[in-house]
Amino acid sequence: MLKAVLETTIGSKSKRDLKDYLPTLRNINKLERWALLLADEDFSKETEKLKDELKSGNSLENILERAFTLSREAARRRLKERPYDVQIIAGLALHKGKIIEMKTGEGKTLSSVQAAYLNSLTGDGVIIVTVNDYLAERDSNWMKPVFDLLGVSVGVVLSNMDYELRKAQYAKDITYVTNNELGFDYLRDNMRYDLNEKSLRKFNYCIIDEIDSILIDEARTPLIISGPTEGNTNAYLEVNSLVSFLKECSKDPKTGDYPLEIDDLDGDYTVDEKAKRISFTAKGLNNLEQLLVSKGIISGSMYTDSNFNYVHYMTQALKAHLLFLKNREYIVGDSGVEIVDEFTGRVLTGRRYSDGLHQAIEAKEGVRVANENKTMATITFQNLFRMFDKISGMTGTADTEAKEFHKIYNLDVVVVPTNRLLARIDEDDTIYYTEEFKFNAITDEVYKTYKKGQPVLVGTVSIEKSEILSAMFKSRGIKHEVLNAKNHSREAFIIAEAGAKHAVTIATNMAGRGTDIKLGGNIEHRVRKKIGTNVSLEEFQEAVKNERENYLKDYNEVKSLGGLYVIGSERHESRRIDNQLRGRSGRQGDPGRSRFYVSLEDDLMRLFAGDNLRSLMGKLGMATGEPITHSLLTKSLINAQKRVEDRNFEIRKHLLEYDDVITKQRDFIYAQRNSILKDTAIKDRILVALEEYLSFLLEGTKSSTVSNVFLNEVNSIFAYMLESLGSIENISYLDLKAKLMQIAKANLDEKENLIGRDLFNGFLRYEYLKNIDFKFQEHLANLDSLREAVYLRSYANKNPITEYKEEGFSIFSELIKDIKVSTIRRVLQLKLDSNSSDFKSTKKSRNVKPIHKELSGIVINENKSASNVQVVRSSPKIGRNEPCYCGSGKKYKNCHGKS
């Protein structure tokens, strides 16, 4: 209430920010005459002057107005587009580290030019992040002529580039890159064995396009570099055949809930659709054990070490059959099971569900079941972007998530007014009891609109629903296009014609993000269809000029019909996604209309608002087949969405608390790696570490004589070198420590003299880094297991986060000690000769793959041609071909794995 009163009297924070930018905008407009008089060659000279001023101690704020004026004029000359005042305001907000909300078609891409140019003048680089390679390449090519005129360099990083090319692109003043590539490059850089192979430089300033998609929708999705491991894929096939033998517990037919008393549960498992969770009952576990034994899958108890994983396999199999449906969560394509993004409807190429869920779905669908993978490095987008000195972002829909942006990222949202008043009519939702009545009503509405000639865009939440509507449209003779994950290759063509007369388009949550739907169709696309692509730029421009009259005629005709009519076939969990769909209509002051059709059988209604709405509709006297439109019902729908959004926000905040623990530890490990990469005297580092460890072993020792415990530890490190130690009878700890240090120094000096200082330093660096990487990978697996373990402690009234932090710190302390000791052991015990290959090849190739994992279960494989991968979430297991844990350098199967 107080917030509403304050906004009424003094305006919202967003409005106050806009008001603050007006004096600067007026000054920029006054300077425009100065920029108009400049010759083209003067722009780069002015850029150099501004750079010199910054080097002399001037601030960005003092040169801001001239920089914005220069970049505005450069855009006018090279793009024939003069940024509107609202675009200049958007640029000012971006420079100030804000998130700008600009409606579709208002020119977000051009708005970023001024802020990017100004911040590039420091020489520390600007990164502009987009959601895919197409947009990164398109935007960099589109804006390059502007930046070229200004004398600043522009680069673009694409997924198929090697590290040398990436390094060159990141070195440019302004670099366009996707969020995935940026994250993977950060992780890869921190797995390098040579400083010169790092591609990134300092994280200075970042502008994130579609920031809500990256920092909200993708927030639960850590990036992961993974490597191969051995797994039991046959188990998923075995348990898949058992699904039909188990029965779900009965629910109360009135409430749809399970009995509260455990003894009243009559089945083998319960299903939680909201949390996507399967829980076995005691009876279910007994039945599962009997099934596994009777089918010959296991022998003996299910609760032994070798058999207990079958509970996990069976849980994932049930999830695959009951909670993850074909043509909704995934499709089966040429490359097997492919995940569909719930927010965009696009196929997430290369991504895989984690925890064995993807294997369970593959077994269910009868396709090849791929092996599992282990985590080698990981980071979330939340913590990746928080490393920048300054970040800002732009999107068409951010205001609904303003609270989360502020609380987690300390970013404020500025809603930039449209250049022209919005003419779209947003109607109240129309609500039906059943999905069948709703789809019939949508078909009737589309048929009526189609006959009139007005273009229609119908948004669906799944491929399955889009195909149902498509079949109904066909039966009514409605010509239409379907845009979903199955035919995404035709997206550009379909979107280009979606605003033409008589056009009807069914789209699955993907109404052309990054692409405008223009009334009357797309003139450039129309010309390309006529004259082809093998023509010169001059011929193309002439053809566009000749086609313009016909295009304007079509545009005005569609405009007179009411513009684009957007129909939502269902409310999404997030209001942002609904607003994105609405935003396809009413571009740049064009007329438009939008309406959502909802039924009580929709997922959102059924899970979060069904009972309340059903009661309200009954009170309003609604019959089963009748529609109802009422502001109370619309408000109830929005409240349901808010509840889901709040729940998802809490989940993301909770995940961030866990990830912050890993972040601090990762930062420490990466700092150690960087220090070692730069170190030219690693021998001294190892000797210091040895002395510290020996001192640690001596701490708290009261006896004056050497204990067996101390000797055993020393023996594990020095091994054969102890022959030169001589008698230790009656020797003190301090004297023994001094002798051991002499032996260690002599050992390392001898090896250094044998192969040379530089080569030996390189060898030590490689061994140290290899050990850090191997141990840290084990540590990540341990943290994963710890996280699952502490969750159960909430039942004992313990805070899982606190438990995770405390135990995480404890095992991290052990990790640091273990890294040092195992490295010392390895370099001391290894025998070198001048022909040894151990030090001649210190850059062994490692089979690693970047993947992208959602904590609720998604992974991504960046290498599209590589075999599918998965992240393991269990106790760490050493593969037969991995290096042995003892540090000998041998494979595990040839060392301690023999026994």
UniProtKB/Swiss-Prot annotation:
<dbReference type="InterPro" id="IPR011130">
    <property type="entry name" value="SecA_preprotein_X-link_dom"/>
</dbReference>
<keyword id="KW-0963">Cytoplasm</keyword>
<keyword id="KW-0067">ATP-binding</keyword>
<dbReference type="GO" id="GO:0043952">
    <property type="term" value="P:protein transport by the Sec complex"/>
</dbReference>
<keyword id="KW-0997">Cell inner membrane</keyword>
<dbReference type="Pfam" id="PF07516">
    <property type="entry name" value="SecA_SW"/>
</dbReference>
<dbReference type="InterPro" id="IPR036266">
    <property type="entry name" value="SecA_Wing/Scaffold_sf"/>
</dbReference>
<dbReference type="InterPro" id="IPR014001">
    <property type="entry name" value="Helicase_ATP-bd"/>
</dbReference>
<feature type="binding site">
    <location>
        <begin position="105"/>
        <end position="109"/>
    </location>
    <ligand>
        <name>ATP</name>
    </ligand>
</feature>
<dbReference type="GO" id="GO:0046872">
    <property type="term" value="F:metal ion binding"/>
</dbReference>
<keyword id="KW-1278">Translocase</keyword>
<feature type="binding site">
    <location>
        <position position="895"/>
    </location>
    <ligand>
        <name>Zn(2+)</name>
    </ligand>
</feature>
<dbReference type="InterPro" id="IPR036670">
    <property type="entry name" value="SecA_X-link_sf"/>
</dbReference>
<dbReference type="Pfam" id="PF21090">
    <property type="entry name" value="P-loop_SecA"/>
</dbReference>
<keyword id="KW-1003">Cell membrane</keyword>
<comment type="function">
    <text>Part of the Sec protein translocase complex. Interacts with the SecYEG preprotein conducting channel. Has a central role in coupling the hydrolysis of ATP to the transfer of proteins into and across the cell membrane, serving as an ATP-driven molecular motor driving the stepwise translocation of polypeptide chains across the membrane.</text>
</comment>
<feature type="binding site">
    <location>
        <position position="87"/>
    </location>
    <ligand>
        <name>ATP</name>
    </ligand>
</feature>
<dbReference type="Pfam" id="PF02810">
    <property type="entry name" value="SEC-C"/>
</dbReference>
<comment type="subunit">
    <text>Monomer and homodimer. Part of the essential Sec protein translocation apparatus which comprises SecA, SecYEG and auxiliary proteins SecDF. Other proteins may also be involved.</text>
</comment>
<keyword id="KW-0862">Zinc</keyword>
<dbReference type="GO" id="GO:0017038">
    <property type="term" value="P:protein import"/>
</dbReference>
<feature type="binding site">
    <location>
        <position position="884"/>
    </location>
    <ligand>
        <name>Zn(2+)</name>
    </ligand>
</feature>
<feature type="binding site">
    <location>
        <position position="886"/>
    </location>
    <ligand>
        <name>Zn(2+)</name>
    </ligand>
</feature>
<keyword id="KW-0479">Metal-binding</keyword>
<keyword id="KW-0811">Translocation</keyword>
<dbReference type="GO" id="GO:0005524">
    <property type="term" value="F:ATP binding"/>
</dbReference>
<feature type="binding site">
    <location>
        <position position="516"/>
    </location>
    <ligand>
        <name>ATP</name>
    </ligand>
</feature>
<dbReference type="GO" id="GO:0005886">
    <property type="term" value="C:plasma membrane"/>
</dbReference>
<dbReference type="InterPro" id="IPR004027">
    <property type="entry name" value="SEC_C_motif"/>
</dbReference>
<dbReference type="Pfam" id="PF07517">
    <property type="entry name" value="SecA_DEAD"/>
</dbReference>
<dbReference type="GO" id="GO:0006605">
    <property type="term" value="P:protein targeting"/>
</dbReference>
<protein>
    <recommendedName>
        <fullName>Protein translocase subunit SecA</fullName>
        <ecNumber>7.4.2.8</ecNumber>
    </recommendedName>
</protein>
<dbReference type="InterPro" id="IPR001650">
    <property type="entry name" value="Helicase_C-like"/>
</dbReference>
<dbReference type="InterPro" id="IPR011115">
    <property type="entry name" value="SecA_DEAD"/>
</dbReference>
<dbReference type="InterPro" id="IPR014018">
    <property type="entry name" value="SecA_motor_DEAD"/>
</dbReference>
<dbReference type="GO" id="GO:0005829">
    <property type="term" value="C:cytosol"/>
</dbReference>
<dbReference type="InterPro" id="IPR000185">
    <property type="entry name" value="SecA"/>
</dbReference>
<keyword id="KW-0813">Transport</keyword>
<dbReference type="InterPro" id="IPR044722">
    <property type="entry name" value="SecA_SF2_C"/>
</dbReference>
<keyword id="KW-0472">Membrane</keyword>
<dbReference type="InterPro" id="IPR011116">
    <property type="entry name" value="SecA_Wing/Scaffold"/>
</dbReference>
<comment type="similarity">
    <text>Belongs to the SecA family.</text>
</comment>
